[in-house]
Design a protein with these regions (language model features):
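Conserved polymerase palm-domain catalytic core
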Residues: 19-185
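Duplex nucleic acid-engaging cores and interfaces of nucleic-acid transaction enzymes
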Residues: 1-7, 41, 51
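Short, glycine-/Ser/Thr-/acidic-enriched flexible segments
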Residues: 1, 150-151, 193-194, 198
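Active-site and adjacent loop segments of nucleotide-processing enzymes
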Residues: 187-219
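Electropositive, glycine- and tryptophan-enriched low-complexity nucleic-acid-binding patches
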Residues: 6, 10-25
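Solvent-exposed aromatic/hydrophobic patches embedded in short alpha-helical segments
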Residues: 3-8, 12, 117, 121
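General helical structural elements
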Residues: 6-9, 142, 161, 208, ...
Length: 219
């Protein structure tokens, strides 16, 4: 199964990769979380975008709709055998509490091709925001939306809700989605981003120190 998935990945990635949104960084060749953080800092400085909506998606990869995944792939791939292979992979089912159950939503985590399918799925969001000239940075399901003013941020947040929940059938965790001023720092991917510098999140520093203490012999 993994061999087949790898073969599919080798076929599909070069087809979709060139047209993905330039501010999408997760699970893409030669792209990293550090580049995503650098892009966010650049947006703050170059375009004067002083407010950021930090979107929180609830169990994103467990909620990907199979028909929408296949529709996304079908935009560029019409080969029925490829589409059928992807469908069979998606609908292979999962073991839950010791029992086998078929699935009609979700991309199995750990699958070789799952990250690419997730990017194909979420590219609809990326391109819809781009079409509206709304600047975003996305690393997998970690999304930042940039705005000039609090009012604009609220408007952009509603647009993002409509696309993610309406078009893509995902669930936005509204309690954990919030708007912040860049001067207070924007936590993202283990860093805190400010207009003029980036620091490591305190909890990451603490975890590192705890690990060092754990590995250091005590006299």
């Amino acid at each position: 199964d993994r061999v087949v998935q790898q073969a599919l990945l080798n076929i599909l990635q070069p087809i979709f990769e060139p047209d993905f949104h330039p501010s999408s960084y997760g699970y893409r060749p030669k792209r990293s979380c550090h580049q995503a953080v650098a892009k966010a800092e650049r947006f703050m400085n170059k375009y004067g975008l002083r407010y950021v909506v930090d979107m929180d998606l609830s169990k994103c990869f467990d909620r990907l709709d199979h028909e929408l995944i296949l529709k996304g792939v079908n935009r560029k791939v019409s080969d029925g055998s490829v589409l059928n292979l992807i469908r069979s992979f998606l609908e292979a089912g999962v073991m839950k509490d010791g029992a086998y159950s078929e699935t009609d939503i979700g991309s199995p985590q750990g699958g070789v091709i799952s990250p690419l399918l997730a990017n194909i799925y979420l590219d609809h969001f990326d391109q819809e925001m781009r079409r509206r000239n709304i600047r975003i940075v996305r690393y997998a399901d970690d999304i930042l939306v940039f705005a000039r003013t609090p009012r604009q941020a609220e408007r952009y947040k509603q647009i993002a809700y409509d696309i993610l929940e309406g078009d893509l059938k995902l669930v936005v965790n509204k309690e954990k989605t919030h708007t912040t001023s860049v001067y207070k720092g924007v936590p993202y991917l283990g860093f805190v981003i400010y207009p003029k510098h980036v620091s490591i999140q305190p909890k990451k520093i603490k975890a590192f120190k705890d690990k060092v203490r754990e590995l250091t012999p005590r006299n």
